[in-house]
Amino acid sequence: MQKFILIRGHQGSGKSTFAEQKAAEFKAKYRDAEIVHIENDLFMTDENGVYRWSGEAVDKAQKRGNALMTETLKIGRQNPNRNILIIHSNTNQKASRCRHLLDLVKKSGFETEIYRMHNFYPNLHGVKEHDVLAAYIKLNQNRVANEIHVEAMQPASAEQLEKIKQMQAFEQQPLSFDEAQQTFVTENYLQHGSRNFTAKASKRYPELRVLKYARSVFYDNRFDDALLEMRGLII
């Protein structure tokens, strides 16, 4: 049996724990199985269990994960009777990236399963709540066919649900213009319009971020005045 499990979920949704559960189930059924777990956080945690985040570390983790994926698929193709499980448990917010991974493993003959996590546990790495909620919304807006929604053991609180509602309502409101700063890229836009842009941290100056409209904005023609102003903006 050769299987690929894609786990999607915001920070603190229980992805890592669920991945361990699925790995144990597979190992119990196929005792000689090779388990390959791909997750950026695992690659950014040292041998002493210390998590070290940086833009450079993320890039290295992604490259390491991609290389491990390629190598494991190659082993699977060369050994079709070998029991292998690949678990990919990053947040996996982009549906296009998920589809690419699924197409890739199917070409190598792997069976696939997709799971979406909905828990709201405290995330281990101090990600701001707004960023967590934005990731949750983005996942809702970027669904993948045949994904299995895992019932939450610890669902969102009433307060979190209200914040999610406010963030979603933001998209229905006209843009506000900050007269003092002479910009459409307001604090409110940065807080609630995050699905429309990416913020990439500088490797040399990690406190700075470069803003750029999301690729989906281009494909869906969802440009607004803030996004037109934003390209290449550094904050």
Segments (PLM) and residue ranges:
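Conserved glycine(s) of the Walker
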Residues: 14
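Acidic, metal-coordinating catalytic cores used for nucleic-acid/nucleotide bond scission
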Residues: 87-101
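Short, surface-exposed basic-aromatic patches at helix termini and helix-loop junctions that form
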Residues: 24-28, 99-113
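Conserved GTP-binding G-domain of TRAFAC-class P-loop NTPases and closely related GTPase folds
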Residues: 2-4, 8, 107-235
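Conserved substrate/cofactor phosphate-moiety recognition/catalytic segment
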Residues: 17-81, 118-125
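Residues that form ligand- and interface-recognition hot spots within folded domains
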Residues: 9, 22, 90-92, 116-119
